Structures are given as C-alpha cells and as structure tokens.
Amino acid sequence: MNFDVAIIGGGLAGLTCGIALQQRGKRCVIINNGQAAIDFASGSLDLLSRMPSTTYGENRAVENLKENITALRNELPAHPYSLLGAEKVLAKAQDFERLANELHLDLIGSTEKNHWRVTGLGSLRGAWLSPNSVPTVQGNELFPHKRIAVLGIEGYHDFQPQLLAANLVLNPQFEYCEVTSGFLNIPQLDELRKNAREFRSVNISQLLEHKLAFKDLVKEIIESSQGAEAVFLPACFGLENQEFMTALRDATKLALFELPTLPPSLLGMRQRIQLRHKFESLGGLMINGDSALNATFEGNKVRCINTRLLEDEEITADNFVLASGSFFSKGLISEFDKIYEPVFESDIIGVEGFNQKDRFTWTVHRFAHPQPYQSAGVAINAQCQVKKCGQFLTNLYAVGNVIGGFNALELGCGSGVAVVTALAVADEILAK
C-alpha cells in the first residue's frame, strides 16, 4: 500500500498532523494501536505551564507564554520549542486554536496567557486551552458564581464531591464562595452498580445518552443544587460531544460545569472522537488495532514499514511521521539496561545527565522530583526530522511526546508539544 504520508500513532499529535495534511491534498494513513493518552487526559491542553526546576528551585508557574517560551531556550536547548523557536511555536499554537474552532471542540483560552482550571480534587492547574464546560478563572480574578453545589453520583467512586468542595475554598479565587456537596440519585444506573468495574464515566454516559427519564434527571439536579447558582458535576454526561450537557444546562437554567474524573476521561475521548471523524471525513485512512513493527531504509530515507497485521504487505510512503507517544503508548520501550524506540531504532536523548544505557541516570532519589527517564525520547532537529546513528533521516519526522529532551509532566507542555510539532511537520512536508 502506498501513501503520501504514513503516520504511526493515532493520538492528539498524529490526528492533528493527519488533518492538516489531508486538508491540503495529501493522502495519509494512520496506524493506530489502540487508545491514546488523550483518552485518559483532562481535556485541557497545556502549552507551557511551568518553568524547569533547575533554575527556580520549585517550578515557577507560567502566565505570559511568549516571554517564557523564549526564556526556555536557555534552560532546555533540546526542547522542541527551543529547536523550533518561539515565533513558530506561537504561530502553530494559534493555528491549532483556529483548527479547534473549526472542528467545534468548544475550547477557550489563548496564547496570550494561561488560565487556571479546576481539577477533580479542587485544586487549580494552569492551562492554555480548556473545554468551555470546565470551570476556569483568569489570574487572581474571583469565580463569577458565589453559591456552588458540587454533586457526585451515588455509588460512583471516581469523583469525590466532599473532597473537592473542601479543597476548592482553599484557593483565593474561590475563598469567598459558599460551596456545598451532595449526590445525585439516578435510578437508571442501578444496573451498572451491580458491577463496580462497569460503573465508570463511559458506561454512565452511554446509558444516559438515550435521555432515559431526562426530566427526572433535570429535577434531581435542581433539587440537589439547593439554590446554588453554579453546579459542578463529574464529566459523565455526553460521550461524543457536549450536546447532552448543553441540554441539561438549558433545562435546569443553572450554570452547569463538568470536571474530569479518574480515567477514562470523557473530556479527552470527545476530542479524539471529533478529531478522528474529521480526519476520516477528509479521506484519511485509519488502520485501527495495528502497530508498526520495523522499517526498511534506503540511504538516509525510510522506504517502507511493516505492521503486525499486515506483515506480508509493505506500507510505503513519501514521508513518515512518528507520533507513537512515550512509554504509556509503547512509543518508547524500557528494558533493564536500555531505553529505545522500537520501530526505527532512532537515537535517544534526554535532559542533561541522562544516559539511555546507564540505568543509574534514569532516576533521582526523591520520588516526587522530576525523573530523568521522563525526558527520554527521539532526537530531532529544527525541522523535526529524526536522528538515527548520528544522521538525520530526510523523510522521517517525529511529533508529540515520542520526542526527547524535555519532561512534559514537569513543565506541563505535553499537549502543546503534540499540536505544535504536528502542525510544524505538516508544513515541512507540504513545502517539499
């Protein structure tokens, strides 16, 4: 099978790159092994939330994105943002904002500055873009609603309203609020309660999607809110989009917000579903449940790849994009004595002091500190071309968290790196 571009990985980076290429006439295939990290994510995207701890002791929260992305180059020269340059990073981030608006992902935020989003535990985390159904505040501004009811679902343990309510008022933006907590009694969920493993956000959403006893649910929310102006609910209402949540908001006449629960996350799954629908509607091909095994090279180019399900049939393409993610998605593999990228056997880099073949450099003794192994990934140049055996391959690009040289967990930049590198690589391929 021959394509213009073959993309390995169907997460946020792979789908974003595929959509950008399909929109401009390229014929793409995405080889997708299964669920991606986006299915377990909060639904909020971070461009850069914190600066490295090496200089500032504790990680300093980022508010002004342009200023800090520029300063990041001095701290982490191998970070994808440092290689691309602040101007291109911000331009690609703004391109994604336009794409998200076009796809009706219902995201709010901008590259001007970060905002705070409320987490499922009641703390605040910096974010670049968040679903408009998630409660957010800008800087030190007070939350606009004084009386808040935090409502869980009886028997659902992946969302704890009492804990959230107690933590929420510890934040200066919410300390003036009157916050109560309670539980919704939804009889339609009794069948799910018989098996705790099935009582998850996805199962709840699928059952409620049919709007069974919708009026009863509306009545239960109104009564449980006890006169509150705003209601915080677990993200269990609406699997593919916000239509169900919007219907509830209109029917209750309340300011309803939803918060991410323990994974799987409906907020992240909605985004992946909408991105995938867009990619396929543009004519892109998704090969699901398959994984790339190895590649064949000709000089400094990739000629073809083989996959697990199509082992006897080569997939050839003019260009290849590695969007396989990090350890979670098996884009990187860790063995006792080495960390490696399994498909192309690309060169691996990390933060200063990290050595992929020296296990003692992978961790630091303090468990809660940033761990060097979290920065492992493939080496790239300013065009996001992948390095192998000391040379950059001309038609192999890397996007997203398979790239090394930075710790996405420490810096809060994983989804930003994913979309920025994806759109930058699309431009590189289209410019050929």
UniProtKB/Swiss-Prot annotation:
Catalytic activity: a quinone + sn-glycerol 3-phosphate = dihydroxyacetone phosphate + a quinol
Cofactor(s) listed: FMN
Any Gene Ontology biological process: glycerol catabolic process
EC number: 1.1.5.3
GO CC, alphabetical: glycerol-3-phosphate dehydrogenase (FAD) complex
Pathway, per record: Polyol metabolism; glycerol degradation via glycerol kinase pathway; glycerone phosphate from sn-glycerol 3-phosphate (anaerobic route): step 1/1
GO-annotated molecular function: glycerol-3-phosphate dehydrogenase (quinone) activity
Keywords, ordered alphabetically: Flavoprotein, FMN, Oxidoreductase
Enzyme type, top EC level: oxidoreductase
Record carries keyword Glycosyltransferase: no
Pfam families named in the record: FAD_binding_2
Protein family: Belongs to the anaerobic G-3-P dehydrogenase subunit B family.
PANTHER family in the cross-refs: ANAEROBIC GLYCEROL-3-PHOSPHATE DEHYDROGENASE SUBUNIT B, FUMARATE REDUCTASE
Described purpose of this protein according to its UniProt entry: Conversion of glycerol 3-phosphate to dihydroxyacetone. Uses fumarate or nitrate as electron acceptor.
Entry-linked HAMAP family: Glycerol3P_GlpB
Subunit structure: Composed of a catalytic GlpA/B dimer and of membrane bound GlpC.
Full protein name: Anaerobic glycerol-3-phosphate dehydrogenase subunit B
Species of the source: Haemophilus influenzae (strain PittEE)
